[in-house]
Amino acid sequence: MALLVEKTTSGREYKVKDMSQADFGRLEIELAEVEMPGLMASRSEFGPSQPFKGAKITGSLHMTIQTAVLIETLTALGAEVRWCSCNIFSTQDHAAAAIARDSAAVFAWKGETLQEYWWCTERALDWGPGGGPDLIVDDGGDTTLLIHEGVKAEEIYEKSGQFPDPDSTDNAEFKIVLSIIKEGLKTDPKRYHKMKDRVVGVSEETTTGVKRLYQMQANGTLLFPAINVNDSVTKSKFDNLYGCRHSLPDGLMRATDVMIAGKVAVVAGYGDVGKGCAAALKQAGARVIVTEIDPICALQATMEGLQVLTLEDVVSEADIFVTTTGNKDIIMLDHMKKMKNNAIVCNIGHFDNEIDMLGLETHPGVKRITIKPQTDRWVFPETNTGIIILAEGRLMNLGCATGHPSFVMSCSFTNQVIAQLELWNEKSSGKYEKKVYVLPKHLDEKVAALHLEKLGAKLTKLSKDQADYISVPVEGPYKPFHYRY
């Protein structure tokens, strides 16, 4: 794979699609800043003291306009940053160009191959001979996974001289990961150990990545402290819910121009993401059906006036299918073959394994017709009818549209800044062990408060007597940790 790192006139490394888009990216970044009060407040509060001075931060998170504002907040606080995207389709090329020119090393472009994607991840981790980053901002856990798999392979190599075998897995993406690690062992058999020893901690953005972290914690294999940003209330109850409520119909309409009203739409999963998607489809006039494994979530859906059925009950009747589960094997080839002609199938979970893309791609005689980028019609030979797959089964709101709007991402990314500051400021205190942590309630409330003025909201103030009556401080936090919002 003949990819070469390029350099700006100032010597900053990068690899993006088109640097001539940098001015366009800068204009949109300036618009987004006005819609991201939490990040701008973080610059005002922490910028003068430069708390990240000397810190090297690697980020693996969708390289969008909103992420550009996050990156420039980290650099405004003193950090050096190297960045890649966490999805092959989610990069906004003008955003990548603007950041590469002005602020940080970026390795990302829309439409990467899987090999290019992991090359970009490697580059974002490559801080030269001194080791890896001090801090990681992760989305989905791929960067964290690469370090952990690298350390595991180096330990096996040290004991037995055995290289990892890419042919030991059927997973095409994991084959690439093992190939990267194998090649790295030939030049530096301690590369990932050096990274592991340097990393102070990681802050993880998504449900999928958080699951990976908790699994590693349970197995005793987590190599450094982690902060679970996803489960901050001001992330999961806003980004996951209201963000998806905005960006799902945006992606559907940009990709297909379909009229949602009157259609039958199936939402697989009724967590925060599923709730946002179901609300958007219902408000657009669709008849929404939910599939669920959890009786509590299923009951919530019925209380919202939604039908709860199995996929098998409705697969031949629905017009739109949306997976939101974070699990695998939700819509399989047999389901797709039973769907209506031109049924729309898409995913707004994290990875591409909620929809059986491998089964579809390898089905004998199936024909793929690309309508436009990230919108494909797959025609089955048995019936000569087809289905429309968006973003190749990956995140359709970022592949077919521009993802969540700036304001709601300001909530999520302000949590990221606070998490990174917390890890960095406590790096020598021993406060954080090799475990997964959630930010405390008072910081969650602070993030929310930073976004109220922009919306014209005014908070009521408790009196001392009122605060004493409900046993909370006058200035908060106002809810116990176990409170369900």
From Swiss-Prot:
SMART domains recorded: AdoHcyase (SM00996), AdoHcyase_NAD (SM00997)
Listed InterPro entries: Adenosylhomocyst_ase-like_sf, Adenosylhomocysteinase-like, Ado_hCys_hydrolase_NAD-bd, NAD(P)-bd_dom_sf, S-Ado-L-homoCys_hydrolase_CS
GO BP: one-carbon metabolic process; S-adenosylmethionine cycle
Cofactor: NAD(+)
Superkingdom, taxonomy of origin: Eukaryota
Pathway it works in: Amino-acid biosynthesis; L-homocysteine biosynthesis; L-homocysteine from S-adenosyl-L-homocysteine: step 1/1
Residues binding substrate: 64, 139, 205, 235, 239
Entry binding sites for NAD(+): 206-208, 240, 269-274, 292, 327, 348-350, 397
Short name of any one Pfam family annotated for the protein: AdoHcyase
EC number in record: 3.13.2.1
GO cellular component: cytosol
Protein name: Adenosylhomocysteinase
